[in-house]
Amino acid sequence: MAGTFGRLLAGRVTAALFAAAGSGVLTTGYLLNQQNVKATVHEKRKLFPPSADYPDLRKHNNCMAECLTPAIYAKLRDKLTPNGYSLDQCIQTGVDNPGHPFIKTVGMVAGDEESYEVFAEIFDPVIKARHNGYDPRTMKHHTDLDASKITHGQFDERYVLSSRVRTGRSIRGLSLPPACSRAERREVENVVVTALAGLKGDLSGKYYSLTNMSERDQQQLIDDHFLFDKPVSPLLTCAGMARDWPDARGIWHNNDKTFLVWINEEDHTRVISMEKGGNMKRVFERFCRGLKEVERLIKERGWEFMWNERLGYVLTCPSNLGTGLRAGVHVKLPRLSKDPRFPKILENLRLQKRGTGGVDTAAVADVYDISNLDRMGRSEVELVQIVIDGVNYLVDCEKKLEKGQDIKVPPPLPQFGRK
């Protein structure tokens, strides 16, 4: 019990959570009952040795399956976070989904901030595998949201159709989406929407709850790439993130639909700056300005984001730790995309290719979603600059191929950026 209340208090500057003694007694009774249920289930599992519970991962191709061993599983299986989240809950999405046709997935999620410490013996090697060798035990994350440092941020708009930068943020003291209760999810919505109401100028806007939105309006926002898709992704469904859908989910956007915040999808929040065309520097400037203001407004209300110097910003999927940043463009590459050197060029530039509609889609009319592969080991400014330089290189290659000229595979980028 002390651990649970400690987590809640850690996320608040104020102790107003326990203002009403009567409701406090009811809350205490409810939490005790919930913990008793979890404890009973957990004790039942201990009747079997860990070897009897070890998942069959022989046909799997994800980071978790590569890193998990019977010894690690035996050591961690019976551990729980203060919120009652287990190793098996962390890895279930990777057990249920052996691999992905387009990208290599992580194969596990965190249920709360403490998951990354309690189950560090599996999370650390997974993080190292996913993030190009970043070691969370010996390295520190560096944050830099100074958009003035960006250079050459205007793309050739004959090729680049749109530009986008996004990140995620989690509210400290509340469980992450795989483990959150309805009450916690609604609290996330309340905290974030209340804070967003304080945005001014070109950032001011309105919140649209999915609960009150028609199917037609939802689909239109999805088709226009403003709103997250319906919960059909295996990551969401197998990890328990689609529970109670669409309760306490929604989208906030400014009047121009160039600054958006998703609430309670894969993460507590996703903060997005986007616009048509190729002005990535302007997109990133708005992103930095808006994100800083959102954090200020969150703190003003007694909350804070999950962060530590080793992991950076803490999010549900280990792939989004560190900056949580994905800077991407929709770019037309009809010739380069058919060149056998294309995958190696992307690899050396530390870029990732997705289909036109995202990770689970194919390219339409040779339009690809190109973004940074890394999230850790480099700052936000460094990652956006990598995308700018890399996409400009891809466009130059496309132009050369149009003229019948040869192209070269660039040398690989250094493993990490600023120390």
UniProtKB/Swiss-Prot annotation:
Gene Ontology cellular-component terms listed: mitochondrial inner membrane; mitochondrion
CDD domains: creatine_kinase_like
BP GO terms, sorted: phosphocreatine biosynthetic process
Xref: Pfam families: ATP-gua_Ptrans, ATP-gua_PtransN
Residues the entry annotates as binding ATP: 162-166, 225, 270, 326, 354-359, 369
Domain annotation Phosphagen kinase N-terminal: ranges: 46-132
Keywords annotated in UniProt: ATP-binding, Kinase, Membrane, Mitochondrion, Mitochondrion inner membrane, Nucleotide-binding, Transferase, Transit peptide
Claim: Nucleotide-binding is one of the keywords in the record: yes
Matches recorded under Gene3D superfamilies: ATP:guanido phosphotransferase, N-terminal domain, Glutamine synthetase/guanido kinase, catalytic domain
Subcellular localization: Mitochondrion inner membrane
Domain of life, per lineage: Eukaryota
Record-given protein name: Creatine kinase S-type, mitochondrial
